[in-house]
Amino acid sequence: ALLNSKVASYVMDFLSPTLDYNQGAMGKIPVDVSEKIFDRITELSKQNISIAKKDWDSFETSWNFKRHYLVKEGHQLSEIYSVWQQECEDRYITLKKNEEEINSLFIELYGLEGELTSEVEEKYISITRADKQRDIKSLISYIVGCIMGRYSYQKDGLVIASKFMVDMSDVAGLDNDNIIP
């Protein structure tokens, strides 16, 4: 958490004014945190990791991708998208608030109240926000993946469909010649 805070960036500007952030310069950052503050920073860091993992795992590029976030049985796409949009915004706000609290704790700990603010600019929050164009492209990619046998709308996760599969009912809707009609 410290190395991702504004305090570390501020201190590293003095210890290593170039981009050479090796272990020697990083190891010179003094760390003296009370147990109470350490516990709070740990809690916030774990929340941030969980939020980032959930965000990352909602996309096909993740090894832990299960199912597209816009595919839910029995719901209108517009309703699903509204829920997705709210989930993204909630994650974004929580992550930003947590990062700012971590910054605030370290700024206070190092006595840098007059030098730094805890605010985190939006461009530095790496959590995905809902974007209709990107989300529809992602949904189309997932649907093509279902048609080609990479995914199944019946099962979560990666499904490698081939002529060697014993139970082809597991991949309903699979296109036999991999040419989408």
Where are these regions (language model features)?
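Basic, amphipathic alpha-helical recognition segments used for DNA target recognition
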Residues: 1-28, 36-51
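Non-catalytic DNA-recognition/assembly elements of restriction-modification systems
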Residues: 31-181
